[in-house]
């Protein structure tokens, strides 16, 4: 049985002080609710680099900490970059790779994502590899063609699909308030599974909120969610994972 994995992606939001306040409020509310995570659920947050070393205490210690990016080389003259070894030293367990914002604003290619994926696995980090189509591609009925191409290139030479997570995020639904229908999200995640295998954990991302996550996660081929804005509010995040 595949686990459900819900990761909140904070993107470039919250200072370290704000993150520490989030932890305090998270611990306070979850203690009052006597909240215990489902044994089949892994929940976590992809934090900015400045907050990755945040102290894990109380119920917050049950969450997995993920990074939002790292460099494909172990070390070297790469000013401003972070290595897998540095992430591991901070207790990071997962890393988001190939997010559409990285692809668009920093010109990350499938080939770069592929190198990062292999580097993550080599260093015992779980890569969350993001794929998704633009609104133009969606309207042109090219969604599956685009996803297949991204999967083939980003996951090239991957021998064990149980070592990764794939996050399907239709770009037209990220931060727009538009959400793919549950049927469409399931159809695309099922298609991704046909390109990988039954062991692959597949998340859906794109305007996921407390009021739609339950229906999304009830689908056969949707194993979790990569959540943006809703994870920034501690009460909303708790509603997502409880």
Swiss-Prot record:
Homodimer. This is Triosephosphate isomerase. Substrate binds at residues 9-11, 175, 207, 228-229. It is found in: Cytoplasm. Disulfide bonds: none annotated. It catalyses: D-glyceraldehyde 3-phosphate = dihydroxyacetone phosphate. Belongs to the triosephosphate isomerase family. Its EC number is 5.3.1.1. Its main location: cytoplasm. Keywords: Cytoplasm, Gluconeogenesis, Glycolysis, Isomerase. One of its GO terms (molecular function) is triose-phosphate isomerase activity. It comes from the Bacteria. InterPro entries: Aldolase_TIM, TIM_sf, TrioseP_Isoase_bac/euk, Triosephosphate_isomerase, Triosephosphate_isomerase_AS. Pfam families: TIM (PF00121). The active site is at 99 (electrophile), 169 (proton acceptor). The keyword Membrane does not apply. One of its GO terms (biological process) is gluconeogenesis. GO terms for cellular component: cytosol. Pathway: Carbohydrate biosynthesis; gluconeogenesis; Carbohydrate degradation; glycolysis; D-glyceraldehyde 3-phosphate from glycerone phosphate: step 1/1. NCBIfam families: tim.
